[in-house]
Amino acid sequence: MNISVTATPVKKIKTELLVVPFTTGALKKNADGILQDLGYDAVVLRDFKADAGELVILYGAAGKAIAARAALLGMGEGKKVTDFRKAAAALALKAMDMKIESVAVDFSGVKGFASSAKSSVASICSAFIEGCYTGSYRFDRLKSDKLKKKKDESDKTKEISELVLRAEPAQLSAVEDGLAAGIITGSCQNMARDLVNLPGNLLQAEDISAAAVESGKRCGFEVNVFGKEEIEALGMGGLLAVNRGSQHPPTFTVLDYKPEGKVAKTVALVGKGVTFDSGGISLKPSEGMGEMKSDMSGAASVIGAVEAVARLGLPIRVIGLIPATDNMPSGSATKPGDVITTYSGITVEVGNTDAEGRLILADALTYAKKQYNPDVIIDLATLTGACIVALGYTVAGLFSNDDRLADDIFEAGQITGEKVWRMPLWEEYDEMIKSDVADVSNLGARGAGSVTASRFLEKFIDGHKKWAHIDIAGPSFSAKGAKVSGATGFGVRLLVELLKKWS
């Protein structure tokens, strides 16, 4: 998608689809005059409410309207940045369905939009572009069309090849800044989605590492990949235990972005990289198991976030740590009741092999603290079904030992639309993960599953005072039936916004 900004008057822009955005307030004030000036009948406004993401397509009379087609795009009240992202996603989705390749958006009123949302012009534009990337995303690389008896070009969805934002001359610079940031964040989020959408037979631990290496080459940050022998030498018993049933070796990948000049903060991001989770010996039910290819969503989002930070040039050192393996049953697989020794030296009784994510995260969290001692440690993981029971599929669970850190993450979630809700992390829950034969069990008693998993993880941060765990099991993947099913890339925007705040 070629995205550009222009100050050319709207009436002189040549495009297949002219988009006129309206907030609910603007709709009431001057919508009739705007539409009539552009050559369209204002009668359509009777049914248009300007709700965020609402679209009405107009067809102009030949020689009267400035474009053959126009779209009224609702921005809601315009008081939330997320409304602009939502509207853009709806626009992109509609344009692709209509096979429109050229779109122009009249952003002449962007300064007013920013004022209403108590934000900046750049932030509004960035959110809008992110929404365009979200709505235009398709994962169809594995489709061959071989079974179609007749290939009909009209059936093929066309991508938007050109998107133009029209702005007033005084706002051009800010719009361009927002556009550039939105392209980076949006493309990095879609990169993460591509990784998650790959099936388990096409994405193993080594492929995740290769994706990280390629990202580092593109964006100039260091990537170090530890193979199985090195993982064994480190004594990462959690990662090795999960990998025991697999025919494919594990990897532990470290991405290290070091900005030039003064570093404002050093942040470690840990992403769970289970490429396919069968549950191991504690085998999952077959229904929905195919979606367990998404159990490496945390890893994908960490790669996307590190790349985005590098491309944005933020003055934050960001270290991404990704323990990766699949979790499979076999004659050599770890069994319920086994006791393992983690990288930290803490012993764990494996009460359930389907509670594998916390085992590989345990090693990575300890490694982050011991090797880098960063200012902040944040891990992202599709960790528990219990978090879905508590919060559903649109909100992630947030657990943290630091109130200020939790507040910052919550605020970033509100801005980006990747919302989190803080959950308890009290020591009373430790009783539920006690073991009679080891230091701790990876399986809690019935109830509070997302909380006991978080209490388990906290034992492996080696006393670090600023740590947060984000359970993205719910919002990381959309089941079939959604407007765009599959991976969402949840966490990329959230982390980037958080790191911008700390810059």
UniProtKB/Swiss-Prot annotation:
Return the cofactor note field: Binds 2 manganese ions per subunit.
Domain of life according to the entry:
Bacteria
Q: Which UniProt keywords apply?
A: Aminopeptidase, Cytoplasm, Hydrolase, Manganese, Metal-binding, Protease
Quick one: a GO biological-process term for this protein? proteolysis
Record EC number: 3.4.11.1, 3.4.11.10
Its subcellular locations are: Cytoplasm
In which residues is Mn(2+) 1 bound?
Answer: 277, 354, 356
Question: Which Gene Ontology cellular-component terms appear in the entry?
Answer: cytoplasm
Give the positions the UniProt entry annotates as the active site: 284, 358
Cofactor(s) named in the record:
Mn(2+)
Q: Which SUPFAM superfamilies match?
A: Macro domain-like, Zn-dependent exopeptidases
**Keyword Protease found:** yes
Q: Which reaction does it catalyse?
A: Release of an N-terminal amino acid, Xaa-|-Yaa-, in which Xaa is preferably Leu, but may be other amino acids including Pro although not Arg or Lys, and Yaa may be Pro. Amino acid amides and methyl esters are also readily hydrolyzed, but rates on arylamides are exceedingly low; Release of an N-terminal amino acid, preferentially leucine, but not glutamic or aspartic acids
Q: Which positions are annotated as binding Mn(2+) 2?
A: 272, 277, 295, 356
Short name of one Pfam family for this protein?
Peptidase_M17
InterPro entries for the chain: Leucine_aapep/pepB (IPR011356), Macro_dom-like (IPR043472), Peptidase_M17_C (IPR000819), Peptidase_M17_leu_NH2_pept (IPR023042), Peptidase_M17_N (IPR008283)
What this chain does, per the record?
A: Presumably involved in the processing and regular turnover of intracellular proteins. Catalyzes the removal of unsubstituted N-terminal amino acids from various peptides.
Q: Which family does it belong to?
A: Belongs to the peptidase M17 family.
The record's annotation in PANTHER family points to: CYTOSOL AMINOPEPTIDASE (PTHR11963:SF23), LEUCINE AMINOPEPTIDASE-RELATED (PTHR11963)
Q: What is this protein called?
A: Probable cytosol aminopeptidase
Which organism is this protein's natural source? Chlorobium limicola (strain DSM 245 / NBRC 103803 / 6330)
User: Which lineage is the organism of this entry classified under, starting from the top rank?
Assistant: Bacteria, Pseudomonadati, Chlorobiota, Chlorobiia, Chlorobiales
